[in-house]
Amino acid sequence: GCNYHDLADYAAIQINDTHPSMVIPELIRLLGERGIEFEEAVEIVTRTCAYTNHTILAEALEKWPRAYLDAVVPQLMPIIEKLDALARTRTKDESLAIIDKDDRVHMAHMDIHFTHSTNGVAALHTEILKNSELHGFYELYPEKFNNKTNGITFRRWLLECDPRLTATLEQHIGSGFRKDAAELEKLLAFADDETVLNELTAVKKTNKAALAEWLLRTQKVAVNPDAMFDIQSKRLHEYKRQQLNLLYLIHQYHEIKAGHLPAVPLVSIFGAKAAPAYTIAKDIIHALLTLSKVIAADSEVSRWLQVVFVENYNVTAAEKLIPACDLSEQISLASKEASGTGNMKFMLNGALTLGTMDGANVEISQQVGEENIYIFGQ
């Protein structure tokens, strides 16, 4: 038979953000059905579960009215109430309670109290959690807090995404990087090799031509493949600052109209979706589409500047955009981006990064050197 007392030795349950938090009371309930007392069930669940905080935005730290949970999961509310009572024996700080004075159930609070690990997803993000957003919990459980910087799979975002670049790399450094990303450092030996640099430039040019063809076929937009491809692809949110990019493009439009021409033509590409009820995000999309139409109708400007908004942006579209990118926009409001992974995907495919000192940009700049990333702001 099964020995549920040793569950943590055989299973690990990862709670990514607060959306799966109900696994805690539900697992306690299931263990109770199998004859395990509440106190031991809590201890088993705490050792089995770990919590990752992916963002400090309040919208992702779910708080549910007790009345909702009473109606939807009545079998779990008594367990949540017992967990709240247990948490209150550990601290008198009301702000760390699971059920607050307004009868709202804080999922993140339940996660931190009753898991064995709480981690952020970039070094800066974890420090913000410890020193600001979750400081009270850090003082209570310093041993639980740790950092695990986000990452990407090179199989998807280099080998599958950019086969031309992969083949070129293999010609010069072998295939070891397919299994060990550190092998890519061998490429540094060719930093001043004009032949290799020309080959890499040719790969980028071919990828840009392929993206131009895809945009014409799927978006019915013709772009200049010889222009600089400036890409910002991520979910539409105020803190990610697509609106800052928009204001820059409006400025560029007026500069061109005034006769101040850029050094090279620019194609600015946006890939994003807005949450269904996020009105401001939808307004930003509307503004981008309007600007795109204004520029397209002005032959004086459109020779130098184009704005493209990719509809129904998804991973398939990302696999087209990322290998063709010249300039990667990672311009979130500093302290608000927990990590980001687009910054990694674009740089892996040879794009230059323009960004703020935020999220994983901090660690990327340390890895590649400040001279190889364009950081602005505080």
Language model features by range: what are they?
Residues 2-8, 31-43, 55, 59, ...:
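Secondary-structure transition/capping motifs at alpha-helix termini
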Residues 4-15, 24-32, 62, 66, ...:
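Glycine- and acidic
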Residues 18-24, 49-59, 125-128, 154-157, ...:
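Flexible loop/turn segments at secondary-structure boundaries
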Residues 32-78, 340-378:
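Catalytic or ion-translocation cores adjacent to nucleophile or general acid/base/metal-coordination motifs
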Residues 49, 56, 205-318:
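Long, K/E/R/D-enriched contiguous segments that form extended
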Residues 64-119, 123, 127:
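Polar, glycine-rich mid-to-C-terminal structural blocks
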Residues 136-187, 323-324, 331-378:
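Catalytic binding pocket for nucleotide-activated donors in carbohydrate/polymer assembly enzymes
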Residues 161-229:
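Extended, charge-enriched "interface" segments that sit outside catalytic cores
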